[in-house]
Regions:
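Short amphipathic recognition helices of helix-turn-helix/homeodomain-type DNA-binding modules
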Residues: 51-66
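DNA major-groove recognition helix of helix-turn-helix/homeodomain DNA-binding modules
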Residues: 36-51
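Core alpha/beta nucleotide-donor-binding catalytic domains of modification enzymes
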Residues: 75, 79-223, 233-237, 242-244
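Recognition helix of helix-turn-helix/homeodomain-like DNA-binding domains
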Residues: 17-33, 55-57
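Short basic helix-loop element that most often maps to the first helix and adjoining turn
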Residues: 1-15
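Conserved Class I SAM-dependent methyltransferase catalytic core
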Residues: 208-273, 277-282
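Residues in the helix-turn-helix
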Residues: 11, 22, 51
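S-adenosyl-L-methionine-dependent DNA methyltransferase catalytic core
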Residues: 62-138, 250-253, 276-416, 420, ...
């Protein structure tokens, strides 16, 4: 800085055309600088990206990140990604797939139409993904009227069971589906609820009164080969990890071996940084085959990819005051990029607590995946503004980001449609998980067929 006659951060910020607050955010480890601001810093100091990343006064953690960024510089620049936001795990899919815990699903095909019952089906994101993977839905349980109408509209042949899952579990799920069909998969995402811990280890009857209990009772009744449960990533740490441990204990009591992993939708062709914890259970009598989660894809879909030629649709609008504020934010930016006095006024108390990370006044960049969509597109703490137009994403744009096909229609008011889409599992993520389950079931089928043939030949010889 001294070589450029810049003697303070104030002067550097002035030369860059930003506030000192914005510069502090760029230099801080707490925030993620957007590419345009890093480029401004390079321009003012008249040095390249590599030189900035190799400054001597970086700590060990920053140096480690330097090496990651330097080796992936072309990738980052092509995607217009934020540097700090992309961890080594995200930047090197080949490295994270070297272990044998994951399978390549690119050539997986179902040997037959595997059967599935889905609970908490919502608007069908997971069910549609599983259908694309090769599953046939035998029954879908959902409480919300509009979500049920959406399912019936798009798949008139699906057995949509609208009702209270507590009562359905009490009555027995087999009273609502074809009882002559063996179920291969039970899927669904029950809410994350805390349990009351009377003892050190809880069993099935100890979690009575929760929606998880209803899921577990139906699992116990159907005894499918596999179950799939998805939830928010916070389940892993919820109540100090006790909640997830209790669920695993209950699943084990019912007769299942359990694996779980946090999967990032962006790693499976979804233009969104949504993360979900995926719990897979395989029946203990089928433990001779090991289930593996799907490998990450070798590409990252961007918002530009997702919204190419998107059809027009309805959408929410910002109030005039909010619109004036967001007009000042560049693509990929957020409240950090606002003039200091505007940010202070707009954010209120949140300004002094760091502004809810980067969610407030956030405008998405075309050339990176979108942040996780919520049920309310204009909510202040989790704003997701269109890159070019100062407005929330429309309902069809929402659906595209969640990887729903354009022909999948939604029923209800605009707010109901946003809610259905925001709550959904991204279709492509559902398909990827589905294909990994198909691979497992294919191997089970192969073993059964081999054993049957061996027995038949032996009997024939005798």
């Amino acid at each position: 800085m001294k070589e450029k006659n810049i003697r303070s951060q104030n002067q550097l910020a002035l030369n860059m055309g930003i506030t000192k607050n914005q510069l502090s955010a760029i230099l801080s480890e707490k925030f993620t600088p957007i590419k345009s601001n890093v480029e401004k810093l390079c321009e003012v100091l008249d040095i390249g990206f590599d030189e900035i990343m190799c400054l001597e006064d970086v700590n060990e953690k920053q140096l480690k990140f330097t090496n990651i960024c330097s080796s992936n510089k072309d990738y980052i620049e092509h995607r217009d990604c934020t540097y700090k936001e992309l961890s080594e795990y995200e930047l090197n899919p080949r490295e994270r797939n070297k272990n044998n815990k994951h399978i390549d699903i690119s050539n997986v095909l179902a040997k037959r139409a595997y059967t599935c019952v889905e609970l908490f089906a919502g608007a069908g994101g997971l069910a549609l993904g599983l259908e694309k993977a090769g599953f046939k839905e035998v029954g879908l349980v959902e409480w919300d009227k509009y979500a049920c109408d959406t399912l019936k509209l798009n798949r008139p042949d699906w057995n949509v069971i609208q009702g209270d899952i507590v009562k359905i579990a009490e009555n027995g799920i087999k009273n609502y589906i074809d009882n002559n069909i063996e179920i291969d998969l039970l899927s669904g995402g029950y809410p994350c609820q805390a349990f009351s811990y009377a003892g050190k280890k809880l069993g099935l009857e100890d979690v009575r009164g929760t929606l998880f209990y209803s899921y577990a009772k139906i699992l116990e009744e159907l005894k499918p080969k596999v179950f799939l449960a998805e939830n928010v990533r916070g389940l892993v740490s919820h109540d100090g990890g006790k909640t997830l441990k209790t669920m695993i204990d209950v699943f084990s009591e019912i007769g299942y071996n359990v694996k779980y992993e946090i999967l990032k939708a962006v790693n499976y062709g979804v233009a969104q940084k949504r993360e979900r914890v995926i719990i897979i259970g395989t029946r203990k009598d089928l433990s001779h085959v090991d289930f593996k989660f799907p490998k990450s894809f070798e590409y990252v879909a961007t918002l530009r990819d997702a919204l190419k030629n998107v059809p027009k649709s309805e959408g929410a609008r910002y109030p005039e005051r909010k619109k004036k504020v967001l007009d000042m934010v560049p693509p990929g930016g957020c409240w950090i990029d606002l003039p200091d006095e505007v940010a202070r006024d707009y954010m209120g108390k949140s300004y002094y607590s760091g502004g809810g990370k980067r969610g407030m006044a956030r405008r998405i960049s075309w050339d990176e995946p979108c942040l996780t969509l919520t049920c309310s597109p204009a909510q202040k703490q989790t704003e997701r503004c269109h890159p070019d137009e100062t407005r929330p994403f429309t309902t069809r744009e929402y659906a595209r980001i969640q990887s729903f096909p354009d022909e999948w229609e939604f029923t209800g008011s605009v707010s109901q449609v946003y809610k259905q889409i925001g709550n959904a599992v991204p279709v492509k993520l559902g398909k990827a998980i589905g294909l990994s389950i198909v691979d497992y079931l294919n191997k089970i089928e192969k073993i059964y067929v081999t054993e049957e043939v061996a027995i038949t030949e032996e009997e024939y010889v005798i």
